[in-house]
Amino acid sequence: MCLLIAEEIGPLEELEHFSCHVCGAELNYAVGMARLGNDVSYISKVGVDPFGKCICNFLKANGIHDDYVWTDDDHMTGFQMKEKVLEGDPTVANIRKHTAFSHFRPADLSGIDWTGVDHLHVTGIPLALSESCRETIYTLMMRAHGKGVRISFDPNLRPMLWKSQEIMARVINDAAQYADIVMPGLNEGRSLTGMDNERDIAGYYLQRGVQTVVIKMGGSHGTYIRTADDQEYRVPSYHVDHVVDTVGAGDGFAVGFTSAILDGLSLEDAARRGAAIGAMAIQVAGDNEGLPTREQLAVFQQNA
């Protein structure tokens, strides 16, 4: 979707000047993977409007294929408005209801060519938007699973998009069982499973067929990993002196972790790369501006 970022500090409803960007957890992930040199296709649906064209132009400019970005003549492209803050989390307003993507349907997926596809990344956000969108994401994950494609799933909870906590947990957990890698934050895991500690949260998903559970512990607490063969790892985070914008940190972690897995690195090294890219992302304003190239990543990890 498109993102209107306030150019002045203050409540969104009182401001007049905004700059237009492109955002979204899945898009941030696609940008990050492309910057690391991976061949990336983006799956979405946009309106026939300036925001939709802006998104497609942005994808092409970042080397991301838009063959699977379908258009909808009858519904608009969704967008967000985000406050400008000096530090910490900004307030974000979502305009998502009745958008083109909320009318995403399983039939839209018929044109996908799975030849040569190694990995699919999904977040829980689309599952909240509509019943048809939910059915489409389930279908996408089942088809990828059937083709032997590795699937990573970041719950990326947005409680304000759901009718209730109970529905959110049920739907997110139903989707998670199709994934090979599930990557919740610690508080997300608690909310979704009712479990308190990271080991039990991981066990909840492992019992449902997930192969690897990666729990982002938050702040300086690093990452906890548990696998289906009951291997456990703890990987520290990187220290950041000045946090500019925390939005996109989780997407950066997902980029680092899954790209490292695709490169054949160990789970521990994958978590280190994820932590590094997450740390780089929060030092720059914007959702994906801080996502690095391989060269920038190498310099950061060498100097950290």
Predicted stretch roles:
Residues 33, 185, 250:
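Short, conserved phosphate/pyrophosphate- and ester-handling motifs at nucleotide-, phospho-/glycolipid
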Residues 142, 194-304:
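Conserved phosphate-binding/catalytic region of the ribokinase-like
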Residues 119, 125-204, 221-222:
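Conserved beta-alpha-beta core of the PfkB/ribokinase-like small-molecule kinase fold
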Residues 51-64, 169-178, 202, 239:
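Short, electropositive alpha-helical surface patch
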Residues 31, 79-83, 222-225:
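Short beta-strand scaffold segments in enzyme catalytic cores
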Residues 39-124, 298-304:
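Conserved N-terminal subdomain of the carbohydrate kinase-like
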Residues 1-65, 243:
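Glycine-rich phosphate/adenosyl-contacting loop at the front of the ribokinase-like
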